[in-house]
Amino acid sequence: MSLAPPKVDLDGQPLRADDSVQFAHDLLRDDILTGTIAPGAVLSQVHLAARLGISRTPLREALRRLIAEGLVTGDFNRRMRVSELDLEDFDQIYAMRFALEPVGIQATIPMLTEQERSELTREVERMEAAAEAADREAFRSAHRAFHLGLTCRAGERIQGTLAELWDHSERYRLRYLHQNGPDGDGTTVELLRRPQVEHRAILDAALAGDAANCTAHQLAHMQHTLAAVFQEAAPPPVPRMSRIAIAESARG
């Protein structure tokens, strides 16, 4: 478990309680989403508090937030665990993305500024460089920034929902596609290169101000990821909710 030493501010003073909550939440959330803390892992409050260098009061608040986000299960009177991965859950996450991302893209693409266009281009270039360097963490950062940049004008509530759905879906993508990849560590150049043609097509449509084409490329990109994740299961289940959402998007 990659937990940091006790956290202090710039003056070397211990963090305030509210800062400690945010610190613990952000670190644990990132470790859960990236699989550093594995699905089903038991979370010992005593151990976590000691490793994080904080008291159990802010830790419990951080864990409450993670429970509310669906990343941790259990309660404070019994054993707490990292939520297991469940392809039915992944199906629902993607169904929601299929429904919301076209709205976000349609709201954003016609409104993009030159700076925002440059930022989208830069994130694709960062992904391409990270793929060649087999740098999974750099790729993950650029990948997230690119896709959320496509919906940045959707409004705070929609964008916040899309960001949360993205983070939850990334947990599955990393687990099923990268950790189960040919080298088992998710850092092969091929795995990171694979989606780059699709990202370039999405980017080209965005830069051209073509929201309809950008949406079509993005939905196709998502369908490929959905299918790849489900194919890792034996036998592959049917992504029922996603299929309904895809059909509705096509009719719209």
Model regions and ranges:
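Hydrophobic alpha-helical segments typical of transmembrane helices
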Residues: 28, 58, 89, 146, ...
